[in-house]
From Swiss-Prot:
Main enzyme class: transferase
Gene disruption phenotype: Not essential, it can be deleted.
Keyword match Transferase: yes
Secretion signal, residue range per the UniProt entry: none
Taxonomic source organism: Mycoplasma genitalium (strain ATCC 33530 / DSM 19775 / NCTC 10195 / G37) (Mycoplasmoides genitalium)
Family of the protein in this entry: Belongs to the CDS family.
GO biological process: CDP-diacylglycerol biosynthetic process
Matches recorded under Pfam families: CTP_transf_1
Pathway membership: Phospholipid metabolism; CDP-diacylglycerol biosynthesis; CDP-diacylglycerol from sn-glycerol 3-phosphate: step 3/3
Reaction(s) this enzyme catalyzes, per UniProt: a 1,2-diacyl-sn-glycero-3-phosphate + CTP + H(+) = a CDP-1,2-diacyl-sn-glycerol + diphosphate
Location of the protein in the cell: Cell membrane
GO CC, alphabetical: plasma membrane
Annotated PANTHER family: PHOSPHATIDATE CYTIDYLYLTRANSFERASE, PHOSPHATIDATE CYTIDYLYLTRANSFERASE, PHOTORECEPTOR-SPECIFIC
Protein name, UniProt field: Putative phosphatidate cytidylyltransferase
Amino acid sequence: MNEKAKQFIKKRTSVFIALLVVFCFFLLISAFADGFNFWSPWSADFNSRTLKVEQASGVTSVISTEINENFKAVRFSFSIIIILIVGVIGSLMIWELFTNILKNKPKLSLSLTLLNAGIIIFGMIGTFVVVYFYKWNATVNGIWTLSFTLSVVLLWIIYIACMSKTRIKFSLQLSYSLGAIACFIASIGTIYFSVIRGWTTIFLLMSLAVSVDTFSFLFGKRFGKNPLIKISPSKTWEGAFFGIISTIVVVALLCVLYSIPFFVAKPTFNQTNGIALNTPQNYDSHNLITNIFLIAFISGGSSFYIYWWVSTLALIFTGSVFAIGGDLFFSYIKRLISIKDFSKVLGKHGGVLDRFDSSSFLISFFFVYHLIAGTISNQRLLMEPNTYFSAITSIQS
């Protein structure tokens, strides 16, 4: 190996270590911001909450609530740090995208970047003010969902309107704006999963993205013969297939490890007349499956455990497909504008968007899934912490 190759590997390794340290710091802050799940530092005794059982319309709900009200201000403070970190990263992704698309309009690219940053940062700070210090009820949830939807539509219109001043074809305007929208939704989703659903949730999602990227590359390089798509000949059907299968196995194993009630006290219920015996809490001690896959909203009772795993594996598969789709989509955009990397912000690793291309589609998918599933089920609101449901018709006394 010559000196140039050694320097290249050294620089890539240095950047990788730096990114890993930043991600670990991000997880730490996420843990400090999260007082909702059993792994939170603010629940070190594992008994600083109560699980209340409610029953209505034949459905038994087990609701986890935080007892110590003093932690709200602390959690809110750390949530702001999460918002700022994600806001900066998301804005860098938008800036890299539009800087390459609108090459002769740097001021316009900067304006679009600042617009995104403003909506993400101030919008989510306002959201968490309500979450922590007021009541997140159905009315607020409806207003937030409508506001989020209108923001996405408005941003999409603004993106296309700005690009219409150039000679970019309308079909390409739609593609470019879709990439920007994915970055925006992924930023909101990352904040949501990190703070409301906990650091274990965002860790599992990022593990899914890294796993499918890594295994697809390794298997594709070794066994790949059939290109997945012409714009990216290095990605093959063989690599994608083995990448998805390997990811399903890896993430399923992580789910199994998370389901082990390690350092988690037996849930206590503030009812003396009995408890719902067949609740998701019995299978999901760390709230992980409920947080990410929302299977508890779909099925309950005696068939819940089997249905839980079948649905979970199906969603891991779907998420893996979206991750590969994000990688291919942004490769397509780079091919259209004739660039290798979106920027050199991360040196030999390229730009921020080059590192989070697959994650942007993956997290966007899961966030929209949460938004839709919560609305359709009409059981747990989007910003409500860890509420469990089982379709049980009676509570045993």
